[in-house]
Amino acid sequence: MISDLSAEIIIIGKEILNGFRRDCNVESIARWLLKNGFSLDKVQIIGDIDKDIAEALKLTKARLIFVTGGIGTTRDDRTRFVIADAFKRKLRLSKESVVCLSEKLRKRNVFFTNRYRELCKFPESALRLDNPRGLAEAFILSVKSRAFIVLPGVPFEIESILALPSFNENIRHFFSTKKCEGHILGLVGLRESEIEDICLDIPEFQRGKVSLLPSPGLVYLILQNKKLLPLLKKRFGNYIFTYSGENLEQVVIELLKRQNKTCSVAESCTGGMLGEVLTSVSGASQVFNGGLIVYQNEIKIKELGVSSNTLKNFGAVSKITAKEMACCVRKKMKSDWGIAITGIAGPSGGSKEKPVGTVFIAVSGNKQNKVIKNIFSGDRNIVRISAVRFALNLLRRMILETVK
């Protein structure tokens, strides 16, 4: 049984290295590593040059190495060839891969050409991995006591591969180990400093055995010792929205599904971000009825049904307007819950009474309504993200109150 469950990630792609495209894969892989008991020690981003890829491969020290990108059909997709050469393995054509890829191409009305034939070649002794949402199959290559997992660079393809039960089984087979789960607690509504203050007397926090990963509106706690879970649950209660690293929007969608409830949204300063976040979750159509982006007052009146007197007397950024927006969208879209966001995201538009970052967030249910005023700090995007996450959490907590 291997005790050193260290891991590294090598990101290949000059478009990422040059800043033309943002990497979206490290987070997904890092979450998988933690949930399966691995420790991520290093991340490298390199271009598509053969010698740079080979050097990066040979310098790795971890037991598990993820390599993403460069296994497609273009000329600069060189990863499989460089890996085979670096570890002195011949590339072999997989007949099974040819059959699988031919069927995928047939469904897309695409001919199987020599270009696609290259996707079916793997280093000797490599284990093929299915790619449910793409053409290029991933593979695992064992080199002495280490395993190289070679994945495509497309984020949604990587996520689909990591979610396969067979993927986890293959990794555990390579390491001859039982599943060793880490824990990712998600806390919403508390700042990083507040969490640290609450946990000052816990030895694991003092010794740096718990990592805090803050982002706008929420903080993730990463811990390996599950014995801490009862204590943290007692201290943080409903501030915890996940014990296994899910996104807040995933938790909200699943909660709505379990309660057989629906929601709809009315957004001003967030410009559709709340609706986008909710609909990014698979299965959201079961519980999300729709949303309206109502920037101008006349649209709030005409399309949503907000009272003109409310807007005239209290303004668009107000507690009363937010409440009406939530109630109106709930009734208009025949939902169980209506969520509304109205505010000043900046950088202009603020005043002494309502500075930039002022946001009113309302949730309306059949029997209860809540409106909360916030003043978020940060740039325009941070304010909008913070508002969306606050709205999701307010909905989550109100749903939980109804099932007590």
Placement of each model-derived feature along the sequence:
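Proline/glycine-rich low-complexity loops and linkers
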Residues: 51-58, 78-173
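Flexible gly/pro-rich beta->alpha loop and the following alpha-helix that scaffold active-site loops
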Residues: 67-93, 236-245
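Short alpha-helical segments enriched in small residues
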Residues: 102, 118, 229-404
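Short glycine-rich anion-binding loops that position phosphate/pyrophosphate groups of nucleotides
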Residues: 14-15, 70-73, 153-156, 218, ...
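An accessory alpha-helical subdomain
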Residues: 143-228
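Glycine-rich phosphate/diphosphate-binding loop of Rossmann-like nucleotide-binding domains
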Residues: 2-43
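Short beta->alpha junction loops
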Residues: 42-52, 375-378
